[in-house]
Swiss-Prot record:
Zn(2+) binds at residues 194, 202, 205, 208. Its EC number is 6.3.4.20. Catalyzes the ATP-dependent conversion of 7-carboxy-7-deazaguanine (CDG) to 7-cyano-7-deazaguanine (preQ(0)). It comes from Prochlorococcus marinus (strain SARG / CCMP1375 / SS120). This is 7-cyano-7-deazaguanine synthase.
Length: 227
């Protein structure tokens, strides 16, 4: 199959490890991937630089960064500098203040618009088990219901060619994601997961902690296999 004949996929590429891995999976499956990132007023804009580097490394056929400033009304520690980033870990049954109201709903809607305009058949997201333990818009039932909406709300869907919402990591934990990223030769050092907006990762926020613990666990597993 020539490059032009490959099916197109839109990938929501934040610049983090999860979205990079989901994007690489789509590429491995033979898709021409268009990356879609968002400048939504997040304090950690450093992730957008990571998204650019990853888009170049993965040789995406297009990469769009959309400006949609959700910090105008805040409601999250990621978009409101007056709120503190939590460092206490993910508490069962509690939605953390890093949840951004409506973020994924907005992102997926824009992704579906781009997919339909580009005649792409899939929209790939990096949401996973660690995400949906805390965030309502990362859960399997949310994705299932949004798929129904996508089929109803688009020309492609009404004509029976609906755009599929895919979350290949949906049931994976962070260790599994790190292992897959390594298998796919993703340069993990190019990715950015920290919630804080500094030039260096803080190592203290929940995102840093979960990522670093997974990296350490995978290193330990790999070391044990070599001895």
């Amino acid at each position: 199959m020539s490059l032009e004949e490959r099916p197109k996929t839109i990938a929501l590429l934040s610049g983090g490890l999860d979205s990079a891995t989901a994007t690489a999976i789509a590429i491995e499956q033979g898709h021409n991937v268009i990356g879609l990132s968002f400048d939504y007023g997040q304090r950690h804009k450093r992730e957008l630089e990571a998204a650019k580097l990853l888009a170049n490394h993965l040789k995406l056929i297009e990469h769009h960064i959309i400006d949609i400033n959700l910090s105008t009304w805040g409601g999250s520690s990621l978009t409101d500098l007056n709120e503190s980033i939590p460092k206490t870990g993910v508490l069962p049954g509690v939605i953390p203040n890093t949840y951004v109201p409506g973020r994924n709903t907005v992102f997926i809607a824009i992704g579906l618009s781009l997919a339909e305009a580009r005649n792409a058949k899939q929209l790939v997201l990096g949401i996973n088990a660690m995400d949906y333990s805390g965030y309502p818009d990362c859960r399997p039932d949310y994705l299932d219901e949004f798929q129904k909406l996508a089929n109803l709300a688009s020309k492609a869907g009404r004509e029976g060619n609906g755009i599929k919402l895919l979350a290949p990591l949906i049931h994976w934990n962070k260790i599994q994601i790190v292992q897959e990223a390594l298998r796919l030769d993703i340069p993990i050092d190019l990715t950015w997961s920290c919630y804080n907006g500094d030039t260096e990762e803080c190592g203290l926020c929940d995102s840093c902690r979960i990522r670093n613990e997974a990296l350490q666990s995978v290193r330990s597993l790999n070391n044990s296999k070599t001895h």
